[in-house]
């Protein structure tokens, strides 16, 4: 028995399903999860000592590659001064100022410890500020695991084949209106029927939790116009896309200004950090200034903040995103060319440092379309690549990530392995 198998068997006795986040269990692809022992640059090593080129990137945060020396040094330096204080620090002020500087839509920001906390509190803030109850979200978009948002959600719930979670009372989601992503007429109808009670619209401006799906032309602009007209709060969930697709996230690429933005992943540099922020008149409703409560023992944790500051400073260097985008586009195009050469039905898309792989003839534009992907073909491809030392997300419904550490040789090795893997699919 391999060391990975031994650890999974052992973990399954003490941890439900053997993992601490469902998609890690390999349920949708089969086989044994890889237990990671260490990581450096574009590579990870499992418990059996096997090396992989990693396109999971800790589900997005590792934009510089794993264990970047300057980030590690910042964490070590911060840790020597204390791990947690439960009191304000200068570093958390610096991180808040840097986020506000990078994202013009953010006039004020509050740090939390996860993306789920950020989206959960942004929803509460929108309701508290507007005095309204209903929220609009989109099918296949994932905004963390708070109860009111686990309705037709993406990410690991799609991997389970069930876009909603047990244990969520119907009353909790009675005020959640779930619509098709990229279907602006449906949103217009919802506002026509419920506009006076819609507190907010929350959206992944580029969806990354039902694989990668970009917004249709006019979709985000339409959401902005509807929210402005009806006095509702527009929330961009940029937990995944923030600082991953560009220096100002999707809002910078599109020029569309949300009222609130949620962040996590990249802003923590691999440590647990989340944030939400936006218009000052909205943020003034948060305690201790207002009556919308939010708190957290580890919010603004000094070690996590140090990692975030180091990461944001490094990715702010000129040319960083142009280079990252070019690398990601090369991967997506190269995989598509090799799949088609092998006669495999396949498409791919990319934006910034994110990419999507689809075993269907065209890039999907909706939750319904992405569900028509050939998941059996994905499983075979996933394991063929894993056997060759290339680590993709263990789900056909998750985006992938390229880092600054994925150099030309690493990308070429990936494409060479993919050529062999696609050939196996037609064998």
From Swiss-Prot:
Its main location: cytoplasm. It comes from the Bacteria. This is Glutamate-1-semialdehyde 2,1-aminomutase. GO terms for molecular function: glutamate-1-semialdehyde 2,1-aminomutase activity; pyridoxal phosphate binding; transaminase activity. Keywords: Cytoplasm, Isomerase, Porphyrin biosynthesis, Pyridoxal phosphate. Its cofactor is pyridoxal 5'-phosphate. It catalyses: (S)-4-amino-5-oxopentanoate = 5-aminolevulinate. Its EC number is 5.4.3.8. GO terms for cellular component: cytoplasm. InterPro entries: 4pyrrol_synth_GluAld_NH2Trfase, Aminotrans_3, Aminotrans_3_PPA_site, PyrdxlP-dep_Trfase, PyrdxlP-dep_Trfase_major, PyrdxlP-dep_Trfase_small. Pathway: Porphyrin-containing compound metabolism; protoporphyrin-IX biosynthesis; 5-aminolevulinate from L-glutamyl-tRNA(Glu): step 2/2. Belongs to the class-III pyridoxal-phosphate-dependent aminotransferase family. HemL subfamily. The modification N6-(pyridoxal phosphate)lysine is found at residue 265. Gene3D superfamilies: Aspartate Aminotransferase, domain 1 (3.90.1150.10), Type I PLP-dependent aspartate aminotransferase-like (Major domain) (3.40.640.10). Homodimer. Disulfide bonds: none annotated. The keyword Cytoplasm applies. It holds the Pfam family Aminotran_3. It is found in: Cytoplasm. PANTHER family: GLUTAMATE-1-SEMIALDEHYDE 2,1-AMINOMUTASE, GLUTAMATE-1-SEMIALDEHYDE 2,1-AMINOMUTASE 1, CHLOROPLASTIC-RELATED. GO terms for biological process: protoporphyrinogen IX biosynthetic process.
């Amino acid at each position: 028995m391999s060391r990975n198998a031994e650890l999974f068997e052992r973990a399954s006795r003490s941890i439900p399903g053997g993992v601490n986040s469902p998609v890690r269990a390999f349920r949708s692809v089969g086989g044994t999860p890889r237990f990671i022992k260490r990581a450096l640059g574009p590579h990870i090593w499992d418990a059996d000592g096997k090396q992989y080129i990693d396109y999971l990137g800790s589900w997005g945060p590792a934009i510089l590659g794993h264990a970047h020396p300057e980030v590690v040094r910042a964490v070590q330096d911060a840790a020597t001064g204390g791990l947690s204080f439960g009191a304000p620090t200068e570093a958390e002020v610096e991180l808040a100022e840097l986020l506000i500087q990078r994202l013009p839509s953010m006039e004020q920001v509050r740090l939390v410890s996860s993306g789920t906390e950020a989206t959960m509190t942004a929803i509460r803030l929108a309701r508290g500020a507007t005095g309204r109850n209903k929220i609009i979200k989109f099918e296949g978009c994932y905004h963390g695991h708070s109860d009111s948002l686990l309705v037709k959600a993406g990410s690991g719930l799609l991997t389970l084949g069930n876009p909603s979670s047990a244990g969520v009372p119907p009353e909790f989601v009675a005020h959640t209106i779930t619509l098709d992503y990229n279907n602006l007429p449906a949103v217009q109808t919802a506002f026509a029927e419920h506009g006076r009670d819609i507190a907010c619209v929350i959206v992944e401006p580029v969806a990354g939790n039902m694989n990668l799906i970009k917004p249709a032309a006019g979709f985000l602009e339409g959401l902005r116009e509807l929210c402005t007209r009806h006095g509702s709060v527009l929330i961009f969930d940029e937990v995944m896309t923030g600082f991953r697709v560009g220096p100002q996230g999707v809002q910078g690429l599109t020029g569309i200004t949300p009222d609130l933005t949620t962040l996590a992943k990249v802003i923590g540099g691999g440590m647990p950090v989340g944030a939400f922020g936006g218009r000052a008149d909205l943020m003034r409703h948060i305690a201790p200034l207002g009556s919308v409560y939010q708190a957290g023992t580890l919010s603004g944790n000094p070690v996590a903040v140090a990692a975030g500051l180091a990461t944001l400073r490094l990715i702010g260097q000129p040319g960083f995103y142009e280079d990252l985008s070019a690398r990601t586009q090369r991967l997506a195009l190269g995989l598509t060319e090799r799949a088609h050469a092998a006669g495999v039905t396949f498409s791919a898309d990319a934006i910034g440092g994110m990419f999507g792989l689809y075993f269907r003839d065209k890039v999907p534009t909706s939750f319904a379309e992405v569900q028509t992907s050939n998941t059996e073909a994905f499983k075979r491809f996933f394991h063929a690549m894993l056997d060759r030392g290339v680590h993709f997300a263990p789900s056909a419904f998750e985006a992938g990530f390229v880092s600054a550490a994925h150099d030309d040789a690493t990308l070429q090795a990936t494409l060479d392995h993919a050529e062999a893997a696609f050939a196996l699919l037609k064998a």
